[in-house]
């Protein structure tokens, strides 16, 4: 009788359960069921935190559309901001991250990748050997008491290449596929948009090592297939774009994007075929135009020694020279590629007056020509007219099908695949003996990343509505939240919970005391559980569970066979 009386006073305590409290604090169940009474879920508005984040976004991009995803993540109790670009994950946020990492582990296993954990501290020496140390201004550099130089690694190409190089001797030791999921660091000048651009972030990076170029390309396609399967299972619309490798090296690269107004990348797609490319790599069909007049823009090399004259045909314009301000007619990415082809690095971000002063002191001059000027040049200069320097504009003709038209859209990059070739293996001496025992050859590498914390922020940006977050099933903190109206016996709530859990549903019970059913429903919307299951009036009278699912537009559906019904709902999420 005493036990029965105690359970009546403390509702929603099932068999094999107990509760304890510290002093006069909240009671916490200690059974094996997932209960919100056992989670720290500090939901609610965090004014100071959100105002600081809004100020950062306004400072970085004053006219950009406001992104509410970070405010929902903070209000729903997923994270807290410590400083600009630095965040603490709370229990709900960690569950989302753990689920995403488990999904990544599953698909990395499909390409026979082994998991490692490299140190976040890398040595300056390796980065100097690869040539990336001086070229990267966003490295977080540190020194120890002996004045030895280190850095907090943003990526691990150097470290993992050196480690593998010390362990391989023959082509028979290959292929090798190693990946890790860990914290990375970048000295972001303007952190913004919450998890989308932070100083500390979690990333999955896979590194592949193959004997031949052909083997490396086969590996690249296998990883791309695994990525497609991963993003398909995630069930969030995504776009794969051809991309430029940048300072990572290599020529083959693809990016995975969520299309959203808060994205900082511009993704171009054709309305007539499957052509998709990012703004660094996008091309359009080169249209021949009469170019009676030439506009010459002026730039300078990164070492300030070389003047760069950029010649572009301007139909209907007057000849004009020494123009320091580039306009919307130029493609800065194409210009950078054209200049790099001449083995000159382009300086960017200089003010007009500064550029004009520096150019007056240069000792060398190189000329770059738009491809449309080729017919007007002598043979020596025509070789320098190999790039289309005109800006890509909406409606331009697709270079692939030559029929469709190009349209831009903002994208959030959440994944990237690189074929690196021998970019790192050569300088770091990752070589193997060949079958003929001839001179050793450098191995061919690939690097494939997924921004784990960024993907969490991107999913929140893409799927939230005015009520709150709206997680896909694969990474939701829980798939179903179960709650009961006052008066529903705890044994019946436990029975429904156990039935769902036994069917493989990841369910959590909202057993928090002192909160009304209406408050719990609003809190569930804010947190973003895929499915809300309610034991209310219909349960008391008809033994039916009320189900809500915002992502599918379902509200108030009653289910007698709730186990099968909920499983079908989740299958669509």
Named regions from a protein language model:
Residues 2-573:
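NTP/phosphate- and nucleic-acid-binding module
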């Amino acid at each position: 009788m005493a036990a029965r009386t105690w359970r009546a006073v403390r509702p929603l305590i099932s068999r094999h359960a107990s509760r304890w409290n510290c002093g006069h604090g909240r009671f916490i169940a200690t059974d094996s069921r997932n209960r919100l009474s056992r989670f720290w879920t500090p939901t609610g508005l965090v004014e100071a935190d959100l105002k600081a984040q809004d100020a950062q976004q306004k400072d970085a991009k004053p006219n950009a559309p406001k992104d509410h995803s970070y405010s929902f993540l903070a209000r729903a109790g997923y994270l807290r901001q410590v400083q600009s670009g630095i965040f603490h994950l709370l229990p709900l946020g960690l569950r989302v991250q753990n689920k995403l990492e488990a999904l990544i582990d599953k698909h990395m296993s499909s390409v026979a990748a082994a998991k490692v954990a490299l140190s976040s501290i890398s040595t300056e020496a390796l980065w100097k050997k690869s040539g990336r140390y001086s070229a990267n201004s966003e490295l977080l550099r540190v020194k120890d008491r002996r004045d030895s130089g280190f850095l907090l690694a943003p990526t691990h190409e150097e470290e993992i290449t050196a480690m593998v190089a010390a362990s391989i001797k023959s082509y028979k030791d290959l292929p090798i596929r190693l990946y890790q999921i860990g914290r990375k660091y970048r000295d972001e000048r303007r952190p913004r948009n919450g998890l989308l651009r932070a100083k500390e972030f979690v990333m999955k990076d896979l590194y592949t090592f193959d004997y031949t170029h052909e083997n490396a390309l086969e590996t690249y396609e296998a990883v791309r297939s695994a990525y497609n399967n991963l993003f398909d299972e995630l069930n969030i619309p995504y776009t794969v774009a051809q991309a430029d490798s940048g300072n990572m090296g290599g020529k083959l690269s693809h990016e995975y994007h969520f299309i959203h107004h808060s994205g900082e990348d511009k993704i171009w797609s054709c309305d007539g075929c499957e052509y998709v490319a990012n703004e660094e790599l996008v091309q359009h069909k080169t249209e021949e135009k009469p170019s009676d007049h030439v506009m010459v823009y002026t730039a300078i090399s990164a070492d300030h020694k070389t003047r760069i004259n950029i010649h572009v045909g301007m139909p209907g314009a007057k000849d004009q020279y020494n123009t320091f301000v580039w306009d919307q007619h130029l493609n800065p990415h194409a210009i950078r590629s054209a200049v790099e082809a001449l083995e000159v690095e382009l300086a960017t971000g200089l003010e007009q007056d500064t550029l004009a002063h520096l150019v007056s002191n240069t000792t060398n001059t190189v000329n770059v020509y738009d491809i449309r000027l080729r017919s007007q040049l002598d043979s020596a200069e025509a070789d320098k007219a190999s790039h289309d320097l005109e800006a890509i504009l909406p409606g331009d003709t697709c270079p692939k099908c030559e029929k469709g038209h190009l349209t831009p859209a903002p994208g959030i990059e959440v994944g990237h695949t690189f074929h690196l070739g021998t970019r790192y293996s050569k300088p770091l001496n990752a070589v193997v003996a060949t079958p003929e025992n001839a001179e050793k050859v450098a191995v061919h590498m690939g690097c494939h990343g997924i921004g784990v914390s960024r993907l969490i922020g991107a999913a929140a940006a893409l799927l939230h509505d005015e009520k709150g977050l709206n997680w896909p099933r694969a990474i939701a903190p829980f798939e179903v939240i179960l709650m009961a109206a006052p008066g529903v016996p705890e044994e019946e709530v436990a029975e429904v919970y156990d039935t769902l859990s036994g069917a493989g549903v990841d369910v959590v019970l909202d057993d928090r005391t002192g909160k009304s059913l209406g408050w719990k429903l609003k809190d569930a919307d804010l947190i973003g559980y895929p499915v809300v299951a309610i034991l209310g009036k219909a349960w008391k009278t008809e033994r039916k569970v009320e189900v809500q699912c915002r992502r599918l537009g379902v509200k108030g559906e009653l289910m007698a066979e709730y186990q099968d019904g909920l499983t079908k709902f989740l299958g669509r999420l």
